Structures are given as structure tokens and as C-alpha cells.
């Protein structure tokens, strides 16, 4: 029971940390949209902005721990199937995506810790660190056999995830894992729908640029979160588009804090999770052999 409670606490801390990062990204982008300063950067730019705030390094250290917790929970939940996705093609795809996102949040946690303890330096305004990361791995993928097709396929998958988010925002159950009072539904559901809609738009833009990068065999066409936001800003009435999506990202961040409090966490026992991970590794080794 103690091990289960430890994992549940880890998950809740992680959801809160992810929510804070999204609120930072959305808040800064919203400020940029209305001309009140801000920035249209990605997650790393948002974290770097805390260096200019009082006790910013302390905040970064706390967020780094939270992101590490979320990375751990993503891997544990994917391996143990804590969300009961099952072993169907769709279920395995979602669990696989969670494994990948776990490593992404681990990288973000290391970056936040680097800012807090001086291992890393923050980018400038609109530094595009997210774009540089996307362009870096896109260049690596393009250098592989059939790289253009692989990058295009990744772009289509990302865009497909975006469409899925939009569908969930439109008529899906965004609160199926939450346990909250009926009177809270009036604000929890709209918050979740706005958040998933904004993520859907961002993923569609990122996926589209990845397809373009693959089609043209130019990694410089790839965009990350910051690049997607700047693309919106550069359109006619861009401040409106950016403002809407930025508000949605902030809403998704707030929804993350709601998840930290109200989400049903079916955390496995630590020993059971370790055993399942070992069995999964053994099954994978047998398939390779």
C-alpha cells in the first residue's frame, strides 16, 4: 500500500508540474498576443523566463522535480497499463506514445535542473529552442535510409494526434479519468475542452511542418511548440489566433492542476510495476531473438 501511495503521489506531482509548464507557455504567448511583452517560445523558453523572476532558480528546481516525477509516472503507467488502455493496436499505440513522452519530459526535467543549478543557459526572447530540437532530430532522421518518408510519416502521426485532440475537445469525454463533484462540471469540462482544442491546433501545425520538412528534405522546415505559436502570430489577424490558442494552452495547464487533484490514479505496487517491466523486456528480447 505504501508503494502504491508513493506512485500515486508521484503521478499527482507530475501532473501539477506539467500543468505549470503549460500555463507558463500559454501565459507568455497570451501576453505576446495582446502586446504586453511575453514570448511565443516553447516549453524551454518558458522555463528559462523564470530565471528573471525572484526565486526563479528555486522554482525551476521544484518544477524539475515535478517533471521528473511525471516522466517516471508516464513510463510506469505505460508499462503497467495503469489507465487500462489494453493490448489492442490503439491501446499499445497510446502506451507507446506515453513512453516517448516520458523521455521527452525527462529531457525537459534535466533542462530545468540545468537552469536551476547553472548547467544550462536560457535562450533569448523567442529563442526557438523547441524549433532547434525539432530540426535537430529531423536532420538525423533525414540522414537515415528512407528518411524523407520516415519524417513525413512522423508528421502524419503527429497531425493525426492533433486531430484526435480536436475530436476529443469537440465531443469526447475529457474528464473520464477525473473524480469530481457534479457542481464542478460547469467549469472543469470547458477547461478541458479548451485545452485539448489548443493542443490539437498546435499538433496539427507541428505535424504539417514535419510533413513539409520530409517532402522538401529540409530539416529547417521543422517546427516545435514555439514555432507553431509564431506561425499563428504571423497570419492575418495573428494576434487573435495566437491569443485563442495561448488561452487554450493556459487552460490545459490549469486542467493539469485539476488532474493533479481529482484524477483517478490506479497506481500499481512498485514491486509489481518493476516485475511487469522486467517481463516486458524479456518478451521484447524473445521477439528480437
Segments (PLM) and residue ranges:
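An N-terminus-focused feature that recognizes amino-terminal "leader" regions
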Residues: 1-68, 90
Amino acid at each position: 500500500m505504501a508503494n502504491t501511495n508513493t506512485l500515486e503521489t508521484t503521478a499527482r506531482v507530475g501532473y501539477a508540474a506539467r500543468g505549470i509548464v503549460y500555463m507558463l507557455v500559454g501565459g507568455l504567448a497570451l501576453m505576446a498576443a495582446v502586446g504586453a511583452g511575453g514570448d511565443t517560445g516553447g516549453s524551454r523558453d518558458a522555463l528559462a523566463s523564470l530565471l528573471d523572476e525572484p526565486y526563479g532558480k528555486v522554482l525551476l528546481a521544484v518544477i524539475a522535480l515535478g517533471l521528473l516525477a511525471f516522466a517516471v509516472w508516464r513510463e510506469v503507467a505505460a508499462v503497467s497499463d495503469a489507465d487500462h488502455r489494453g493490448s489492442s493496436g490503439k491501446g499499445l499505440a497510446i502506451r507507446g506514445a506515453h513512453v516517448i513522452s516520458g523521455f521527452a519530459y525527462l529531457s525537459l526535467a534535466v533542462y530545468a535542473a540545468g537552469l536551476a543549478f547553472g548547467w544550462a543557459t536560457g535562450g533569448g526572447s523567442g529563442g526557438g529552442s523547441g524549433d532547434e530540437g525539432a530540426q535537430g532530430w529531423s536532420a538525423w532522421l533525414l540522414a537515415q535510409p528512407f528518411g524523407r518518408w520516415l519524417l513525413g510519416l512522423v508528421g502524419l502521426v503527429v497531425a493525426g494526434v492533433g486531430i484526435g485532440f480536436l475530436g476529443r475537445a469537440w465531443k469526447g469525454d475529457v474528464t473520464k479519468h477525473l473524480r469530481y463533484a457534479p457542481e464542478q462540471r460547469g467549469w472543469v469540462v470547458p477547461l478541458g475542452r479548451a485545452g485539448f482544442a489548443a493542443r490539437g491546433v498546435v499538433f496539427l501545425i507541428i505535424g504539417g511542418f514535419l510533413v513539409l520538412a520530409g517532402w522538401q528534405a529540409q530539416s529547417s522546415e521543422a517546427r516545435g511548440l514555439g514555432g507553431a505559436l509564431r506561425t499563428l502570430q504571423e497570419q492575418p489577424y495573428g494576434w487573435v489566433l495566437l491569443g485563442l490558442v495561448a488561452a487554450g494552452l493556459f487552460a490545459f495547464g490549469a486542467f493539469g492542476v485539476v488532474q493533479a487533484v481529482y484524477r483517478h490514479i490506479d497506481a500499481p505496487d512498485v514491486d509489481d510495476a518493476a516485475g511487469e517491466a522486467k517481463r516486458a523486456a524479456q518478451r521484447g528480447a524473445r521477439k528480437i531473438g
